Structure formats: structure tokens, C-alpha cells
Swiss-Prot record:
Residues 142-261, 273-406 form the C2 domain. This is Synaptotagmin-2. Residues 136-382 are annotated as: Phospholipid binding. Changing E52A: Wild-type binding to BoNT/B. Exhibits calcium-dependent phospholipid and inositol polyphosphate binding properties. May have a regulatory role in the membrane interactions during trafficking of synaptic vesicles at the active zone of the synapse. Plays a role in dendrite formation by melanocytes. (Microbial infection) Receptor for C.botulinum neurotoxin type B (BoNT/B, botB); interaction is improved in the presence of gangliosides. The toxin binds via the vesicular domain (residues 47-60). The lineage of its organism: Eukaryota, Metazoa, Chordata, Craniata, Vertebrata. It comes from Mus musculus.
Length: 422
């Protein structure tokens, strides 16, 4: 047993080996004093090396020291300026956001207060929002006043209207005045319309003009007298200042009447459709001959009681506002779409062709009274729109007839343009 135990223990004993032993240097004990080479000392060495290298590189640059210092100062200033701008922008943005936020809260509070106050007011008055708006009254605009007179002759069945004077009219012109005149007519019939003379540059015109309407007394009650004051403008549409309406069934015509009435706002007159006319122009320069052919008209204004007209056409050759020659067509009875096809010739030398105008007027023939103008146009070198284009086409195509439709214009408008072109 003892032998077995010894045999089992033998492998645990390491065999003796011969190894070369190296002499070891004595190891100094660890010391935490400042004399040891730590990381702080290595960083200082690196910084010193970098500093030395940096100055060596600078010394290689072929510039004087003062130039290098100046460049460094400028670079520093630029850097500081950029930093300042960035900081300022950030601060302003924060301030703006804060201000808008505060303003939004304030507006919300104000709206809430206003709504609450409005609700309280509505509760006190018992009015809803729509009813409150309806109660607001606009102050009437002061348009001035008109003095007029009325006198009815029962034996002659004739109403005499006197337009006496106006006062305190508003200024519609640039100079602080107006050029007023009065239109007088009886509704619902606008065919018979009178006008006073134009009074220049005044707000208190004295008209003192009378006009007569032949109306049976039985029919007078269904009519309304209208006296509308306009501001005359030579080169554009006349502006209405105001009007006085007198329903005749509210007036006692047993004795003459004279009174003042305030002007009320008048409705602007829509441009009246007067109809269209087709004309043909032909000019032969070598012969100095102008041929005007009146072909037809359509959709003319109704001038007669029966809803028709008796139209005919007048042609005037004019130069510098003077009538040189006059021609006219035959009368076409009871029609608003007459067909004429009538030609008229005028002798005009080539050197004068650009100095003349051809005025075409459509009139309604009246056997008993005055023939009334339905509408008017003129063609020539100083015309405008389709009239000027028609004249230019005629001159560009000598010896060739050029036909063109034209819309009729009010007589006074065309006369004003002709007067401007004198």
C-alpha cells in the first residue's frame, strides 16, 4: 500500500531543469512625486513643439510683421462681426415670436371682451345682430336744392314748368365748381325732353327758363315730372348731380305753384341704344371724288307713339367746323330697319382729303313738328374707333368701295367731338 501511494504522488513532482538565470535590474519603488514624466508634461512638450513649428513657418512668409498683425486683427474683427450678427438675429427672432404670441393672446382677449359686451348690449336692447344693423341710418347727402314753378292751363290743356334756380350744388369739377344744366321731362314718356342752358362755373345757377307740355288733364295724374340737374362736360359723359321728382297726382294745380325742393340722388342713365348704320366710302385720288353710299340701318330707336320711326339720313361735308355741302336720303316710313342704298358724291382734291369730315345723321321725320335726330356718326382723319379705321381703309384702297357698320351716338356727343376738332 505504501508503495502504491508513493507511485501515485510521483507525477506531481516537477523534474529538475537547468535554466539560465538573467540578472534583474533593481526596481525602484513607485513614486507619485512631480519628478515623474506624466501626461501633463508630454502635452506641454507637444505645445512647445507646435509653437516652435508655427513661428518657424511664419518666419518663412515674405511679409513684414506689422502686415501679419494687421491681417490677424482684420480676421478677428470679421469673426466678431459674424458672431454679433448671428446673436442679434437669434435675439430678434425670439423677441418677435414672444411679441406675436402676446399680441395673439391680447387680440383673443379683446375679441372675447367685445363679443361679451355685444352680447350684453343685445340682451339689454333685445335686438339681434341683423336688427341692429338695420337700425343704423345713413346721413343724407347734401346735393343742393332746386326752385321751380308749375302752372296748368285748363283751356289749352297745357302744363308750364318753370326752372327758376338752384342753390348749394356740390362741386364736381377740379376747380371746385360745376357747369350745371337741367333736363325736364314727364315720365313715363321720355321722348319729349327739354334742357336748360349750361351755366359755367357756378354752384348757385339762376336758370329762369320755362317749358310747356301739352297734356290733357285726365292723363296728367298718371305722370311724374322729373327735373334732373347735370354737370356738363365737353369731352366725356355728363354726371348727374341730383333730381327732383314731382308725382302730378300729389299736386293741386288749381293755382300756380312755386317752391324749393331738396335734390335727391338720381339714377345714372344707361347708354341708350340708338341703332346701327352701314355706310360705304370710295375715294378716287386722281379725280378728287369721294362717294358716300348710305346702305341701310337697323335696330333704330323708337321715336313715334306706335313704336316705330320714319327715318331718313343727312350727310354733311365739313371742314374746320364749317358745313361745305349737304345731302339727304328719302324718308322710309314706319320702320326701324330701313334700307336706303343711296349714293352721294363730293368733289374733294387729294390735298384736302385729310382736312374734311363726313357727318352722317339719322333723323325721324315728323310731319307736324321738328324732325328729331336719332343718332349720329362722323368719319375723317380726326375720328376715333371704327370711324377712323373705316376712313383709313378707304384711303389705303383707292377706287374701291369700303363698307362698314357703325353704332349711332347721341347727337350732342358727336357735336362736342366735332367742336373739339375745329
Amino acid at each position: 500500500m505504501r508503495n502504491i501511494f508513493k507511485r501515485n504522488q510521483e507525477p506531481n513532482v516537477a523534474p529538475a531543469t537547468t535554466t539560465a538565470t538573467m540578472p534583474l535590474a533593481p526596481v525602484a519603488p513607485a513614486d507619485n512625486s512631480t519628478e515623474s514624466t506624466g501626461p501633463g508634461e508630454s502635452q506641454e512638450d507637444m505645445f512647445a513643439k507646435l509653437k516652435e513649428k508655427f513661428f518657424n513657418e511664419i518666419n518663412k512668409i515674405p511679409l513684414p510683421p506689422w502686415a501679419l498683425i494687421a491681417m490677424a486683427v482684420v480676421a478677428g474683427l470679421l469673426l466678431l462681426t459674424c458672431c454679433f450678427c448671428i446673436c442679434k438675429k437669434c435675439c430678434c427672432k425670439k423677441k418677435k415670436n414672444k411679441k406675436e404670441k402676446g399680441k395673439g393672446m391680447k387680440n383673443a382677449m379683446n375679441m372675447k371682451d367685445m363679443k361679451g359686451g355685444q352680447d350684453d348690449d343685445d340682451a339689454e336692447t333685445g335686438l339681434t345682430e341683423g336688427e341692429g344693423e338695420g337700425e343704423e341710418e345713413k346721413e343724407p347727402e347734401n346735393l343742393g336744392k332746386l326752385q321751380f314753378s308749375l302752372d296748368y292751363d285748363f283751356q289749352a290743356n297745357q302744363l308750364t314748368v318753370g326752372v327758376l334756380q338752384a342753390a348749394e350744388l356740390p362741386a364736381l369739377d377740379m376747380g371746385g365748381t360745376s357747369d350745371p344744366y337741367v333736363k325736364v321731362f314727364l315720365l313715363p314718356d321720355k321722348k319729349k325732353k327739354y334742357e336748360t342752358k349750361v351755366h359755367r362755373k357756378t354752384l348757385n345757377p339762376a336758370f329762369n327758363e320755362t317749358f310747356t307740355f301739352k297734356v290733357p288733364y285726365q292723363e296728367l295724374a298718371g305722370k311724374t315730372l322729373v327735373m334732373a340737374i347735370y354737370d356738363f362736360d365737353r369731352f366725356s359723359k355728363h354726371d348727374i348731380i341730383g333730381e327732383v321728382k314731382v308725382p302730378m297726382n300729389t299736386v293741386d294745380l288749381g293755382q300756380p305753384i312755386e317752391e324749393w325742393r331738396d335734390l335727391q340722388g338720381g339714377e345714372k342713365e344707361e347708354p341708350e341704344k340708338l341703332g346701327d348704320i352701314c355706310t360705304s366710302l370710295r375715294y378716287v385720288p386722281t379725280a378728287g371724288k369721294l362717294t358716300v353710299c348710305i346702305l341701310e340701318a337697323k335696330n333704330l330707336k323708337k321715336m313715334d307713339v306706335g313704336g316705330l320711326s320714319d327715318p331718313y339720313v343727312k350727310i354733311h361735308l365739313m371742314q374746320n367746323g364749317k358745313r361745305l355741302k349737304k345731302k339727304k336720303t328719302t324718308v322710309k316710313k314706319k320702320t326701324l330697319n330701313p334700307y336706303f342704298n343711296e349714293s352721294f358724291s363730293f368733289e374733294i382734291p387729294f390735298e384736302q382729303i385729310q382736312k374734311v369730315q363726313v357727318v352722317v345723321t339719322v333723323l325721324d321725320y315728323d310731319k307736324l313738328g321738328k324732325n328729331e335726330a336719332i343718332g349720329k356718326i362722323f368719319v375723317g382723319s380726326n375720328a376715333t374707333g371704327t370711324e377712323l379705321r373705316h376712313w383709313s381703309d378707304m384711303l389705303a384702297n383707292p377706287r374701291r368701295p369700303i363698307a362698314q357698320w357703325h353704332s349711332l351716338k347721341p347727337e350732342e356727343e358727336v357735336d362736342a367731338l366735332l367742336g373739339k376738332n375745329k
